[in-house]
């Protein structure tokens, strides 16, 4: 059950981090209170609950493993008292965790405009490896290219943090640097394809597994979770 909870717990933590940057939401119901002290807050309450229930499950796992190698000639009450608490309660906890997780997935939402702004803000930094490769393809030495890119990247990052410059100027500044072999237009072309690696392949693999499970368990496809208190 701890292993089963690890996926929802990890995603819940990721969503909490993303929500901190206003990228996503788990849904905020009418009448829900995010914080009794700060009325504006819309805390990821359900994701926080998933994290807490995962900790509870790990606690029960710790209780049960403490019985390992600690019995005398036979089991006794010191063993059964732990089992009687940990075993049934673990099922209650994993049930509540999964009910909550399904609700989070059902009510999940994202904010594309905020995501686009963040992508535009950080994409030049995330693409410095591509920029470095493009410079090498132009015949520039690796160490020299690395140093120039680092120089402008640090300057751009500090400008974004300390001034009202607004836009990430890394590509503009690199393109204007006579020491660097690419123009701003060439740099934009070099990073135009956002690198997502094997993400699409992984999505397709997971989707195929889900479809197989749906074929096997038809009733699960339309399951409606119990209301969250």
Regions found by a protein language model. Give the residues of each.
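Acidic, glycine-rich loop-and-beta core segments that form the ion-binding/anion-interacting portion
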Residues: 1-61
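Glycine-rich cofactor/substrate-binding loops
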Residues: 23, 40-229
């Amino acid at each position: 059950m701890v292993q089963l909870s690890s996926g929802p717990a990890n995603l819940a933590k990721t969503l909490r981090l993303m929500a901190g940057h206003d990228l996503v939401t788990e849904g905020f119901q009418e009448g829900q209170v995010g914080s009794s002290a700060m009325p504006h807050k819309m805390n990821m309450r359900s994701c926080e609950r998933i994290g807490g229930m995962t900790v509870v499950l790990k606690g029960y796992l710790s209780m049960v493993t403490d019985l390992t190698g600690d019995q005398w000639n036979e089991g006794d009450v010191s063993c059964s008292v732990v089992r009687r608490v940990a075993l049934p309660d673990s099922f209650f906890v994993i049930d509540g965790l999964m009910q909550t997780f399904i609700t989070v997935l059902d009510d999940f939402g994202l904010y594309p405009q905020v995501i686009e702004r963040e992508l535009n803000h950080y994409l030049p930094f995330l693409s410095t490896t591509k920029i470095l490769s493009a410079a090498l393809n132009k015949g520039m030495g690796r160490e020299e290219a690395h140093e120039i890119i680092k120089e402008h990247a640090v300057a751009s990052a500090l400008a974004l943090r300390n001034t009202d410059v607004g836009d990430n100027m890394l590509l503009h500044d690199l393109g204007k640097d006579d020491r660097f072999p690419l123009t701003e237009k060439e740099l934009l072309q070099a990073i135009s394809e956002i690198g997502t690696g094997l993400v699409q392949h992984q999505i397709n693999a997971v989707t195929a597994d889900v479809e197989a499970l749906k074929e096997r368990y038809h009733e699960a496809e339309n399951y409606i979770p119990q209301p969250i208190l």
